[in-house]
């Protein structure tokens, strides 16, 4: 119920026939039926390129423009989504290197993720091994920095040696998971 998959001429890679505004509205309506107000859509650069090439998005813009010609660009696409649907488009462009050293996108080219306003979850700090060890050791000097980085300093004798260990346990939570909607717009 939080996932919609487009097929055939509805896919956003079919620039002549696709209607991304109507598809986004369908997802927004599904969320509203559950009491969720969506505020943002995360997409890849390739998806943004498909939106720029969409004839229906161009027609939405032309319908509000007194001139017969427009230059379609990312800013116009973002503007029409904001004005028509109150959705901010976020293009996620970051890459990582895979095991073969090739650049890979974090965000897939086939998906659009719709998000509500605000935080999707929290960070929770757990008891780290250093904290646990400090509870039972009198020889360790343990301090906590910022929100959960633990620093343990121990002294060893013969030979004289100072050992410093740093650790932290951070666990993400996803309380707003039921407020996130996915649209698979391309194969």
Across the structure, where does each feature detected by a protein language model lie?
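A structural signal for short, well-ordered beta-strand segments and their strand-loop junctions
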Residues: 39-44, 90-92
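Alpha-helical scaffold segments that mediate packing/assembly in large oligomeric complexes
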Residues: 1-33, 42-62
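Sequence/fold signature of self-assembling virion shell proteins
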Residues: 3, 7-9, 15-18, 58-187
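Short, well-ordered loop/turn elements at secondary-structure boundaries
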Residues: 35-37, 160
């Amino acid at each position: 119920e939080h996932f919609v998959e487009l097929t055939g001429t509805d896919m956003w890679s079919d620039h002549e026939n696709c209607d991304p505004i109507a598809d986004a509205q369908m997802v927004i309506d599904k969320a509203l039926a559950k009491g969720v107000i969506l505020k943002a859509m995360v997409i890849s650069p390739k998806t943004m390129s498909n939106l720029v090439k969409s004839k229906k998005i161009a027609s939405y813009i032309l319908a509000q423009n007194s001139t017969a010609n427009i230059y379609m660009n990312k800013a116009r696409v973002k503007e029409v989504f904001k004005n028509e649907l109150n959705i901010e488009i976020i293009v996620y462009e970051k890459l990582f290197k895979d095991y073969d050293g090739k650049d890979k996108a974090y965000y897939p080219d086939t998906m659009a993720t719709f998000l509500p306003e605000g935080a999707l979850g929290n960070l929770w700090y757990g008891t780290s091994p250093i904290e646990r060890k400090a509870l039972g050791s009198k020889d360790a000097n343990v301090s906590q920095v910022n929100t959960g980085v633990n620093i343990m300093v121990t002294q060893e004798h013969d030979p004289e040696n100072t050992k410093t260990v740093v650790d932290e346990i951070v666990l993400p939570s996803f309380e707003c998971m039921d407020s996130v909607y996915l649209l698979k717009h391309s194969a």
